[in-house]
């Protein structure tokens, strides 16, 4: 059972091709492997017809919960951003194994595999589906454990854990790429917006169990302090 497409594939194809002809990227909501595969086929056709999108613009897929193994390489090949929400992976403990079986579960939320294939990951919270706390996102990504229960011990599919530096990159540069705003956001550089948060600890040096204890000391937008503890 592949579920029901919200938008008919032929209609989606017409939207993507029309956008590609004008040089515009498209973001598609794709949860399961059938949706991901269909969207990548459309992006591939658009690229063949009209060439790569202009510099700084990338198509994006949202959620990408379980993959067909043959699609794992295609995101990087087609320069598609994978916008994912790490806390989703533990919303239904035991559910993936029950519904999909052990073979298909191996390709669920495969962050390590995607990064090893040079895919651009973009992190977000997907609030209100999960909590808006960004530290929960980082905790889930590096531990593969639920931010509320801290289960399972050792992490779910622990081989797909990523490092904190990689998680921060996904939450900054990756998210800027998903928004098509890498010239303005994602890194601290001359000429970009000075949007940043000051934290009470170095996330690159702290233990995974301490990530969620992090407090924001100050927030700056455009170089202006808009919050201070």
Per-segment meaning from a language model:
Residues 1-13, 64-66:
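Active-site gating/metal-coordination segments in enzymes
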Residues 17-27, 34-59, 64, 69-73, ...:
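His/Asp/Glu-enriched, well-ordered alpha-helical/loop segment
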């Amino acid at each position: 059972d592949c579920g029901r497409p919200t938008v008919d594939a032929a209609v989606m194809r017409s939207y993507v091709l029309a956008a590609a002809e004008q040089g515009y990227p498209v973001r598609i909501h794709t949860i399961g492997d059938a949706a991901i595969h269909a969207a990548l086929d459309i992006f591939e056709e658009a690229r063949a017809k009209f060439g790569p999108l202009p510099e700084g613009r990338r198509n994006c897929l949202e959620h990408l919960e379980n993959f067909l193994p043959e699609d794992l390489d295609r995101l990087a090949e087609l320069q598609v951003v994978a916008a994912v929400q790490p806390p989703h992976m533990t919303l239904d403990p035991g559910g993936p194994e029950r519904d999909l079986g052990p073979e298909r579960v191996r390709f669920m939320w495969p962050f390590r595999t995607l990064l090893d294939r040079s895919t651009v990951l973009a992190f977000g919270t997907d609030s209100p589906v999960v909590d808006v706390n960004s530290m929960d996102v980082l905790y889930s990504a590096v531990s593969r454990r639920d931010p509320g229960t801290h289960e399972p011990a050792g992490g779910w599919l622990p081989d797909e854990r990523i490092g904190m530096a990689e998680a921060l990159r996904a939450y900054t540069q990756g998210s800027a790429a998903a928004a098509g705003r890498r010239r303005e956001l994602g890194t601290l550089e001359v000429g970009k917006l000075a949007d940043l948060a000051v934290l009470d600890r170095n996330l690159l040096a702290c233990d995974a169990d301490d990530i969620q204890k992090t407090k924001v000391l100050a927030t700056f937008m455009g170089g202006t302090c808009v919050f201070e503890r």
